Structures are given as structure tokens and as C-alpha cells.
């Protein structure tokens, strides 16, 4: 899972002597499409507009603590939303990390839902 990868990277840095308070967690504002013939990504602002007749968004992966999309019942992509960002905010604070950053701003929706969620997650 992404948490295992993040934990491993953070541990490598802290084991090398970098203080956790100097590290930030980077999160994408897109979902990674990995099963398709041509893997790619889909921005959050496109995920929330997917046709609800074919796509189900906001399924929840309780192991990774992230939502994911299914297409006609099959896995399509995982991504972050307000809930998963809040969980990641709690996690980085528990590790004593500096904060969180994202890529990229233009992938957020017009209400800046994810940007606001990052702000809340880091500043609370």
C-alpha cells in the first residue's frame, strides 16, 4: 500500500539522520489508473465528474485509508479525498513531520476541496 511505501521512505530518511520535522508528505491530486492497457492518471476534478451510471466513486479501502473508483464493478483507480487527507494529516503529525504538499493545484475542483482539506489537515 501507499502507506507502506511512505513509511519506508520516511524511515530511510530518519535512519539517515534527517529529522522528521524537516520532512513533508507529498500527495497527488489525481488517481493512478494501473490496470488499463495504457496506464495513466486522472485528475481529482475529473474523478468527481465521472458518469455515475458506469463509475462508483468513494468506495473505501480500509487498509490504505483511501477512496477508490470502480468502473462497472472493477477497480479503476485510487485517489485522495477530504477524509483520506484528514487521516494522513493525523498520521504525519503523529510522526512529527513538518507538513504536507500536493501535486498539482490545477487538478483540484473549483471549490478547492482538496487544497482546503490539506490546510485543515496540517493546521488543525
Predicted regions and their residues:
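Acidic-and-aromatic substrate-binding clefts and catalytic sites of carbohydrate-active enzymes
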Residues: 105-111
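Glycan-binding loop/region signatures in secreted carbohydrate-active enzymes
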Residues: 22-91, 117-124
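Short Asp/Glu-rich motifs
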Residues: 32, 111-112
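Short beta-strand and adjacent tight-turn residues that come in two discontinuous sequence segments
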Residues: 102
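Loop/turn elements at helix/coil->beta-strand transitions in domains of secreted/extracellular proteins
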Residues: 18-24, 95-99
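Catalytic-core region of carbohydrate-active enzymes that cleave or remodel glycosidic bonds
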Residues: 1-22
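Chitinase-like catalytic core of GlcNAc-active glycosidases
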Residues: 1-4, 76, 109
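Extracytoplasmic/secreted envelope proteins and their assembly/folding machinery
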Residues: 3-10, 82-89, 97, 112-115, ...
Amino acid at each position: 500500500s501507499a502507506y507502506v511505501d511512505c513509511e519506508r521512505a520516511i524511515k530511510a530518511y530518519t535512519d539517515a539522520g534527517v529529522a522528521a520535522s524537516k520532512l513533508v508528505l507529498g500527495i497527488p491530486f489525481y488517481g493512478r489508473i494501473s490496470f488499463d492497457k495504457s496506464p495513466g492518471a486522472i485528475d481529482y476534478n475529473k474523478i468527481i465528474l465521472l458518469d455515475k451510471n458506469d463509475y462508483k466513486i468513494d468506495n473505501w479501502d480500509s487498509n490504505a485509508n483511501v477512496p477508490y473508483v470502480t468502473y462497472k464493478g472493477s477497480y479503476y483507480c485510487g485517489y485522495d479525498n477530504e477524509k483520506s487527507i484528514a487521516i494522513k494529516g493525523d498520521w504525519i503529525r503523529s510522526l512529527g513531520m513538518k507538513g504536507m504538499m500536493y501535486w498539482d493545484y490545477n487538478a483540484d475542483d473549483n471549490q478547492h476541496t482538496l487544497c482546503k482539506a490539506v490546510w485543515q489537515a496540517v493546521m488543525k
